Amino acid sequence: MTKADAVAKQAQDYYDSGSADGFYYRIWGGEDLHIGIYNTPDEPIYDASVRTVSRICDKIKNWPAGTKVLDLGAGYGGSARYMAKHHGFDVDCLNISLVQNERNRQMNQEQGLADKIRVFDGSFEELPFENKSYDVLWSQDSILHSGNRRKVMEEADRVLKSGGDFVFTDPMQTDNCPEGVLEPVLARIHLDSLGSVGFYRQVAEELGWEFVEFDEQTHQLVNHYSRVLQELEAHYDQLQPECSQEYLDRMKVGLNHWINAGKSGYMAWGILKFHKP
């Protein structure tokens, strides 16, 4: 097993566990798994998460109904349902967690969107799709889990049509991040490094893509993990026994690592947009 495969397997095992599924489903509101954009510090996580999706959609608002979109690392599929409902896009969800994918399919059925959204089990390092299949690629806070981010970008390039756009968010390290500063965060997600704006721009340039913008929102990373920690502490007892006490205690430690890393000045988060000529 390669290192990238091992990282992917760890991500799958983690998100498929009962404790992780129960935690994310209850705390995030059942639709999303990504970082929210907050107007106030005590805003519901669900509302902030939807605001992130809406803001990313603004970056691709010129695409018409019927646009083919691929969501890489789609989680519970909340973003796909938003795009299908509000923009009429046809969305394919690719995700490594079988548990999340089942929830995704179930909600699509319940919300009458099964004809607009397809859900695929798999890794974004080896996409099960034909070349030049999609108009738009989308990803939220997922690529960090890859042990081979360059391969993810190469696969994205393969399935994206000429004239297409790639919009994504990802918790990143700054381009000048000293070695060791983010170790507590990296150890938690079993990685040696995070991506960076410079890294993604460099790979995109090598692929012949055009950099469109980076909508920098790093402060929201701190806002988000602080809000999740508040909710965990407020609902600690109710989350058990669905989530084990050991899991919740580890999550508290991990959330504090993310908050401290975000405040360190060596993390970055926001919306990146690239265009493939």
From Swiss-Prot:
It catalyses: sarcosine + 2 S-adenosyl-L-methionine = glycine betaine + 2 S-adenosyl-L-homocysteine + 2 H(+); sarcosine + S-adenosyl-L-methionine = N,N-dimethylglycine + S-adenosyl-L-homocysteine + H(+); N,N-dimethylglycine + S-adenosyl-L-methionine = glycine betaine + S-adenosyl-L-homocysteine + H(+). Optimum pH is 8.8. The activities remain high at more alkaline pH but decrease sharply at the acidic side of the optimal pH. Gene3D superfamilies: Vaccinia Virus protein VP39 (3.40.50.150). Keywords: Methyltransferase, S-adenosyl-L-methionine, Transferase. It comes from Aphanothece halophytica. Monomer. Pathway: Amine and polyamine biosynthesis; betaine biosynthesis via glycine pathway; betaine from glycine: step 2/3; Amine and polyamine biosynthesis; betaine biosynthesis via glycine pathway; betaine from glycine: step 3/3. It comes from the Bacteria. This is Sarcosine/dimethylglycine N-methyltransferase. Pfam families: Methyltransf_11 (PF08241). Belongs to the methyltransferase superfamily. Inhibited by n-butylic acid and S-adenosyl-L-homocysteine. It is an enzyme of class 2 (transferase). Catalyzes the methylation of sarcosine and dimethylglycine to dimethylglycine and betaine, respectively, with S-adenosylmethionine (AdoMet) acting as the methyl donor. Activity with sarcosine is much weaker than activity with dimethylglycine.
